[in-house]
Amino acid sequence: MTDLKAITSHFAISGEVAEIKPLGSGLINDTFLVTTRYPDTPDYVLQRINQAIFTDVPLLQENIRYITSRIRYHLQQRNANDIDRKTLTLVPATDERLYYYDGNSYWRLTIYIAGSKTFEQVTPDLAYQTGRAFGEFQYFLSDIPNPPIGATIPDFHNMEFRLGQFREAIARDKAARLAKVQPIVDELLGRSEEMCRAERLHREGKLPKRITHC
């Protein structure tokens, strides 16, 4: 069993760790809330990064560092209040890297935003607020034409690539279920030209690449 307190000791935290317990219901990384003993020191979010998905952890963390620094810069420029609640604060390891490798797993740490929560169901108001937040996110990053961001999962949002995978799966019909869903497959393939429009426009120089997440 992993000694989470020992893992946390490799980061430049303030205060004494009182408790570490699982946090949230995420499906990719293992996430823990690190509670410190006294109210004048922050709590933290500790994550074990899923290396099966994120194979280049240094790149992943550098992406996050760049993006959060740009968001923080723009918030400071507009004299926003409570900035530490509006963007992540990364906590470096004691060797100043933005992750710690224990010989088996990669770990990262951020300051916990008190009172933050996730929602399992989306209401119209939540969808609206999410749209506003995403629009602001795009605005904050739009002033850098070619941001130094690397692809942590190559072709993850490349619809042409994904449709190619889909067509291969159709040809294999590995689970012999194609006949049951053929109308849905036909409808999806009928929309393929529209679905790939963004990639075509980018190749033609008409649509810039945008950062969606790290």
List each model region and its residues.
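ATP-binding pocket architecture of kinase catalytic cores
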Residues: T41-R65, R72-P148
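Short beta-strand element of the conserved SAM-dependent methyltransferase core
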Residues: V34-T36, T110, L188
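Short, well-ordered amphipathic alpha-helices
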Residues: V34, I64-Y73, C196-R197
